[in-house]
């Protein structure tokens, strides 16, 4: 991994204490998205990791609603593969499959179109950030319902203190940046 590129990406992540609620340190990726050089570096770093780890044996990138959509298509293009969308409930037309996951105060659902993938296709899930792992686990469940193979989950940022990586079990996980 290119250390200068990684530092370029890291410098574009801002921290906001007590947002959205007291006691939370929010990691903001907006400056990264505003800077095309930094954004390109983040895509290049993620793609380089996936190329070296999976040697071209990826069929699709699955971008998670909503900020995974910012990275999914660019990452898919860099790898020369397609991109499928995993959306919040009620946002996709046609027949869908759904999976629930817990939120701090309730639950939410993700959906994927039933014809998004064929059984056995190899998929990498991408999101901007991994916190508790609930969204990523629900996405894995959806892809398992389609009998696709989740080869890895990736994100730009990982909040290690929330132990989301552990919830993924045996599924490999990679992040560019780790924060407590």
From Swiss-Prot:
Q: Which residues carry this modification: Phosphotyrosine?
A: 60
The portions of this protein that span the membrane are none
Keyword list (alphabetical) reads: Acetylation, Cytoplasm, Glycosyltransferase, Phosphoprotein, Purine salvage, Transferase
UniProt subcellular location? Cytoplasm
Residues found modified as N-acetylserine: 2
Matching SUPFAM superfamilies: PRTase-like
Positions of disulphide bridges: none
GO cellular component terms listed in the entry, alphabetical order: cytoplasm
Q: Which domain of life is it from?
A: Eukaryota
**Which residues does this entry mark as bearing Phosphoserine?**
15, 30, 66
User: Which GO biological process entries does UniProt record here?
Assistant: adenine salvage; AMP salvage; purine ribonucleoside salvage
Indicate yes or no for the key word NADP.
no
Q: How does it assemble?
A: Homodimer.
Task: Tell me the function of this protein.
Answer: Catalyzes a salvage reaction resulting in the formation of AMP, that is energically less costly than de novo synthesis.
User: What family is reported?
Assistant: Belongs to the purine/pyrimidine phosphoribosyltransferase family.
Query: What's this protein's name?
Result: Adenine phosphoribosyltransferase
Query: Which organism is this entry from?
Result: Stochomys longicaudatus
Task: Read off the lineage from the record.
Answer: Eukaryota, Metazoa, Chordata, Craniata, Vertebrata
